[in-house]
């Protein structure tokens, strides 16, 4: 079970130049494909005069949703090296965009691979990397007389309280590290009037 993952906390910018071609790299924390589409549209608009706007992203704690795009560069010379930097740093929930201004000299496939890899690496180096926990949200409904027992378990296990309502039937929404979720569910479900 994946319990934690690495992502970037802050944006990072990188730069690489080779034979008068300029590579501007931007790393962003993202959590949805919609965020990615919005950011890409903004970069294409802002750098409308650039030859290529290549990118790669990785989403989710399991790192199963990803994509690499060469945007007209020779196949696998731009998106794959960018994605390779994401993988080698074991990051997720990240988008790296590399904007290329053509300098008039062809770099060849190996030159392009190095340039996109180095630009992406520089963007990651200028971003703050953090480790986050994978959390699970638990909703528990209970009768009011069980309040003290529920709150004792909450105090002991220290989940984050998202919301709580108190009435004849009470409800509490908790967020806890995924590896501890089953234990919390078990302890709550074993409560009874005594």
Predicted regions and their residues:
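C-terminal regulatory domains involved in ligand/effector binding and gene-expression control
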Residues: 1-77, 163, 181
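A common structural junction motif
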Residues: 47-50, 157-162, 189-194
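Flexible, glycine/charged-enriched surface loops at secondary-structure junctions
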Residues: 50-53, 127-136, 194
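Active-site beta-strand/loop microenvironment that shapes enzyme catalytic pockets
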Residues: 78-126
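Short glycine-/aliphatic-rich beta-strand segments at the starts of folded cytosolic domains
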Residues: 128-144, 172-174
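Short amphipathic alpha-helix segments
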Residues: 141-158
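N-terminal positively charged helical leader segments and presequences
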Residues: 168-169
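Terminal, non-globular segments
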Residues: 174, 180-183
């Amino acid at each position: 079970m994946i319990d934690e993952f690495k992502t970037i906390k802050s944006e990072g910018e990188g730069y690489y130049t080779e034979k008068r071609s300029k590579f501007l790299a931007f790393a962003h924390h993202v959590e949805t494909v919609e965020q990615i589409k919005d950011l890409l549209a903004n970069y294409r608009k802002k750098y409308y005069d650039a030859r290529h706007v290549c990118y790669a992203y990785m989403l989710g704690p399991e790192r199963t949703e990803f994509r690499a795009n060469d945007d007209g560069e020779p196949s696998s010379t731009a998106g794959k090296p960018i994605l390779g930097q994401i993988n080698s740093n074991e990051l997720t929930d990240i988008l790296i965009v590399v904007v290329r201004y053509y300098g008039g000299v062809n770099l060849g496939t190996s030159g392009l691979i190095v340039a996109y890899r180095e630009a992406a690496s520089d963007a990651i180096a200028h971003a703050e990397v953090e480790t986050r926990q994978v959390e699970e949200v638990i909703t528990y409904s209970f009768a009011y007389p069980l309040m003290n027992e529920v709150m004792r378990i909450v105090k002991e296990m220290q989940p984050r309280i998202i919301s709580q309502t108190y009435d004849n039937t009470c409800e509490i929404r908790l967020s806890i590290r995924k590896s501890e979720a089953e234990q919390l569910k078990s302890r709550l479900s074993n409560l009874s009037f005594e």
